[in-house]
Amino acid sequence: MPEQIIVIAMAVSFLITVILSPLFIPFLRRLKFGQSIREEGPKSHQKKSGTPTMGGIMILLSIIATTVWVTAKFSVLSAGTYLLLFVTIGYGVLGFLDDMIKVVMKRNLGLTSRQKFIGQLIIAVIFFFVYRQSGFSTALHIPGTDWSFDLGWAYGVLLLFMLVGGSNAVNLTDGLDGLLAGTAAIAFGAYAVLAWNQGQYDVAVFCVAVVGAVLGFLVFNAHPAKVFMGDTGSLALGGAIAAVAVLTKLELLLVVIGGVFVIETLSVIIQVASFKMTGKRVFRMSPLHHHYELVGWSEWRIVVTFWAVGLLFAMLGIYIEVWI
């Protein structure tokens, strides 16, 4: 398989997003689809109120169009491709509903936690059912070894945890200009390398399509952001990277490659647990990126630092799987 397929997929995806954004952002402004800012959040965020959100629609359109066209053109379209697109679209639609409630009904929290969880769970259950019926393996691979353990139907529990947990973890990371776009590009880039190394060219194409789309989006989302991806983008990216981990049989490696997402989630869990048990907070605010804001770090410094940490995690993940 020619390596040009990777370059083509990334370039096409990047260009679609870059071309769509200048057209779509003014449209969102006319509809008054602006982001509401929580009053309890950092005061510096209040100036971001009204910034167009739901930019994740552009990311999704780019990913879908690029993946379908490139995989079909190079004859690598497979059942796995459809599963990836299903999860991405499914979680994207769920995020879209959440965003619509926020901007139309002016309810800043969007869907209730229960509603969102049920939606995430339904998509994950359908994914597992189709995954199982398509004959994909239910074995759990131990990274860096030749060991694997067939979990059978119990694999479904792991899969549900990964999809629901992954989408929420990535969603939590979307709190600063360019933070999620950059860390997502790095994480999907790592999985693209590993998928290509396995010969799963359709998964690799999907991953680089995501990389191209979020990098194109980053042009308009870097500080000061002209648009936010909203839950439309963040939930879709979270579900997608979990699905990629499942299809590449590198489920456990997601904890490493997605290390930034894990740390952000743990900071929230630690904060809530500490406050409930002791009445005291460990961090000034969670997720962790907000803690650094209140400590006095500039937004750009936090974002670049998290990108660097994400890159180290991604390199470690590739090293564990390929060279150990």
Curated annotation (Swiss-Prot):
Enzyme type, top EC level: transferase
Known pathway: Cell wall biogenesis; peptidoglycan biosynthesis
Transmembrane segments: 5-25, 52-72, 76-96, 117-137, 147-167, 176-196, 203-223, 227-247, 250-270, 302-322
Gene Ontology MF terms: metal ion binding; phospho-N-acetylmuramoyl-pentapeptide-transferase activity; UDP-N-acetylmuramoyl-L-alanyl-D-glutamyl-meso-2,6-diaminopimelyl-D-alanyl-D-alanine:undecaprenyl-phosphate transferase activity
Keyword set includes tRNA-binding: no
Chief location: membrane
GO cellular component, one term: plasma membrane
Stated name of the protein: Phospho-N-acetylmuramoyl-pentapeptide-transferase
Species whose genome carries this gene: Geobacillus thermodenitrificans (strain NG80-2)
